[in-house]
Structure formats: C-alpha cells, structure tokens
Amino acid sequence: MKKKTTMTVTDIRPLAEGICSMTLRYPEGEAPEEVKPGQFAGLYPNDADKLLPRPISICRWDPEKKELRFVFRIAGAGTASLAAQKAGDTVDMLGVLGNGYEIGLLAGKKVLLLGGGIGVPPMLELAAALSKEPGTEVIAVMGYRDSDMFLTDDIGKYARLLVATEDGSAGTKGNVLDAVRENGVKAQAVCACGPMPMLRAVKRSAMEEEIPAYLSLEERMACGVGACLGCVTKTAKVDGHSHVRNARICTEGPVFGAEEVEIG
C-alpha cells in the first residue's frame, strides 16, 4: 500500500484563469528514488469534510530539491482548498502512483507530445526527460481554449513547441491534431494526455500512420490504489486474474499503449 506523506508547500501561484501551480517538498529521507513522467499523486484538501485525495498528474520532478510540481485546474471545492494553501503550509499526499511513460521505448526517436487542457502539465516532465536522451527529437503540440495559455515557456525549453486554440486566438485554430496537420508534423511515436475525444482521435491517427501511441487516460478516481475499482477502462485483452477485459487506470495506468485499451 502506498503511504501518505506530509509535504511542505514551497511555491504556489496562479498560471492562468482557474489554473494553479503548486510545488511540494518531501521531508528529509522520504523522497522516492525515481519518478516517471505520467505518474500522479493523490493530494488531500485541508478540509475534514473532504476525505478523498484529488488525483493530480506530476508536472515536474526535481530530484535534487526533492520537490514535485503539480499544475491543476480549480474545478471544485477540493481543488479550491488546495489552491488556497500558502508557502510553508503542509499538504498530505498519497503516492507517487500509477505507471508512467517508458522513456526507453521513446529514446532515439522523433516523438510527438500532445497535451489538451489539463493534459498539458504531464507533458512538461516528459519533454524534459526526453530532451536528455541522445538522438531524440521532441515536438510538443499543446491545446488550449484560448490565448490564456500556461506552461508554454517551460515546455518550449525542451521541445519544438506548437499550440492550438479553440478560438484561434493563438497558434492554429482548432485542436492539437489540426495543428499537427497544418504544420506537416511527422513522428515515429506519439504520447498524448487530454480529454477522451482527443485521445480517441489520436489513437485513430496513430493507427493510420502506423506509429506507436501511448495514451494517458483521465478518469475520476476515489482511492488511487486500485481497491475501489472506480476507474476501470476496457482493454483489448482479458485479464488473467479477474477474467474480464478491464484495467484500473490508477494502477495499471494511467499510461497505456493505444492498442491495449478500447476507447472507441
């Protein structure tokens, strides 16, 4: 069972309307040896009425400072409680949780990163990790509602960055795949995180291009450790233990090979 750790807030600030950045530091001697891009943690609101952690993807990991950065949308009372914290406050955290992107499968390739909305933050850690791999070219296409964007400067340090906005106020008008087509982007592998309609389109596109795709699925989670079965997704293969075609996003995922999951 993953343990709960009391983390210290070292930085917290707004990035865009309704978007908050929070950096948390581990207590001495409690940091993990490794954090993979695409993993997440469960952050507990400082409110006794809200017992369940909020699953939030890891935006950045600083192994020297032992700090995790999270960027999240303020979507309800729980995330509003987290966003109200100040530097020096403490936040209880469950994790690190889940399976992330396998850098070894991507190293040495031309890799396309696609992030939509709150699927943008985990792409920063992935871009940073891939930029260290020899012979790896990283192209990041991030999608937003409008020109009130976030993390573009950060991601641009590690990748060739393109953006798409729904209203056309910045970059390509439309979605991330519209930007891919408009700019003639070709890749040898694609990694994506975002809303389900986007992931379905990415899977179809990757199949047409005959390139591997790795998808980070977004789903509501309760426990975060696979016990409640509240975040299952349909899989292509039957699970040898449960004998059903399901996988738990919080434990087997959130990152899956596109061929592993049936998302329509």
Q: Where do the protein language model's features map onto the residues?
A:
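Structural signal for conserved beta-strand scaffold positions within catalytic alpha/beta enzyme cores
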Residues: 11, 60, 163-165, 215, ...
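Ferredoxin-reductase
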Residues: 2-87
